[in-house]
Amino acid sequence: MKIVGISCSPRKGKTTRTSLDKCMGAITENFPEIQTEIIDLAGMDLRGCIACGHCMKNLECSQKDDFNDIIPILQDPDLGGLIIATPVYLGTMSSQCKAFLDRTVMFRRNGFLFRDVVGGVMAVGGFRNGGQEATILHVQSAMLVHDMILVGDGKPGSHFGGTMWSGHPEGIEKDDPGLKTVESLGHRVAQVALKIHG
């Protein structure tokens, strides 16, 4: 089984990717039987959906950009979990995240291929209470349209997902409360994915 993480920041190697690395690391450390992969959208040519309908017939997009390289990874029948990590921009997800989610409509149109895939979301904000939970809910709404199974960060907090603060004076790696939520999110996605997909 495989769990894929998507880093939706336009900035390569920054706080969103660091947070996702921690989340995916918790999976690798605690569930060695699960394969993990991270797709970093930073620097990719990823355009928004143009609603042309081309993908209604097959898993192919009419736009010739980097999303076409992502399709084979996401259509893998071993996909058991999908974790989306996004920065908070003006109280919601990044434009890269929105473009990515809109383009995944092809998986819905071709037999709901994400049905029963376990979904988790994490958001990185510039303030401790900087819109992370609202952003997570926005991403989760797209996952629900795919008929995915959503989980939060589990015990002990059991909230919407991973919530990180990029404004910590000593760097995001010192955001201990936030790190606990992203590590717990990874653990929870893996735990539920194993129960469903074995």
Which residues does each PLM region occupy?
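N-terminal beta1-alpha1-beta2 submodule of the flavodoxin-like/Rossmannoid cofactor-binding fold
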Residues: 1-110, 156-198
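Short, glycine-/small-residue-rich phosphate/pyrophosphate-handling segment
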Residues: 95-96, 109-160
